[in-house]
Amino acid sequence: MKKIKSFSLLLVIAGGLFLAACNQTGSKKTQSSYFESVDSGLQTGGIKMIPIKTAKGTFKVWTKRFGNNPKMKVLLLNGGPGATHEYFECFENFLPKEGIEFIYYDQLGCGNSDNPQDTTMWDLARYVEEVEQVRVALNLNADNFYVLGHSWGGILAMDYAVKYQKNLKGLIISNMMASAPDYSKYAADVLSKQLKPDVLAEIRALEAKKDFANPRYMELLMPNFYAEHILRLPVENWPEPVNRSFAKMNQSLYVTMQGPSEFGLSGKLEKWDRMEDLKKLSVPTLVIGAKHDTMDPAHMEKMSKQVKNGSYLFCENGSHMSMYDDQQTYFTGLIKFVKGVNEGQKKVKL
């Protein structure tokens, strides 16, 4: 009897080891498939320079594919305007292990892409057409194409979706309101009043003189505003990818589109408003807001209800860069949304 029990126990152990080995093999196979090359010829690590046709000539933009999934491909649109893809590098710690492919992309005038140094090209409608050309070049379509726009990238993503939602599988609007006037009002009525009165007075004095290049302006903003509402860490502890990206900011592009002040929009985007147009969107949409953001989280929750198939992710501990200061909430929700849409859900419950 003891021999039979021992033999049965050995069978159970052997079976467990066999299943574990199968799971490891399956995991390795999935990982191998995710990172395998889909290109022929010379290998470039997933980098592709894409020619962009404009009224001013043809320029090249830089893209880099990370991973390989024929059904889930997320194109990342950086903020600024004028920053680079580099602050998205934290995505490498979360999306690959879930089998989600993502694509870095420096918009024209940013990072590794061409910089025409022509302010007439810093135009929202032109950038929408640029994204469409990138989509075509990368063979993205409604079967696999998710676009994630963060901050200014969210503006670009919304305008792209309004015109080209037929090409999208999913839309992610991260930390961006749908109305520039509403954002400016929130900055004036809420954000500025959270500053110490003497700090705000000095900032306003510099802005009144249009002395934005004065080092004192950033000395005031960094600890009192940026570390509270952009990324909630002491500035000296900000992640290297964020610092690297912001150090390469195209100031011409930023000021032309956003304006020089951090409290509202005064550039070309000053009157931009898509709140009503969101009602036209039926593509599954995730809106991400954060408690300490420069953007009004209540407004962003409303955005998720304006679209026909919207989900809202609230980052309780996050700010404008909530992919860093509330990472677990941000990426858990993002991954659940992308996978849910891939499984056929129109409105993903988070």
Per-range role (PLM):
Residues 143-186:
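Conserved hydrolase catalytic core segment
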Residues 18-21:
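C-terminal motif of bacterial Sec signal peptides marking the signal peptidase cleavage site
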Residues 59-115:
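Conserved HGGG/HGGXW glycine-rich cap/lid loop of the alpha/beta-hydrolase fold
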Residues 107-148, 152:
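Active-site loop/oxyanion-hole signature of alpha/beta-hydrolase fold enzymes
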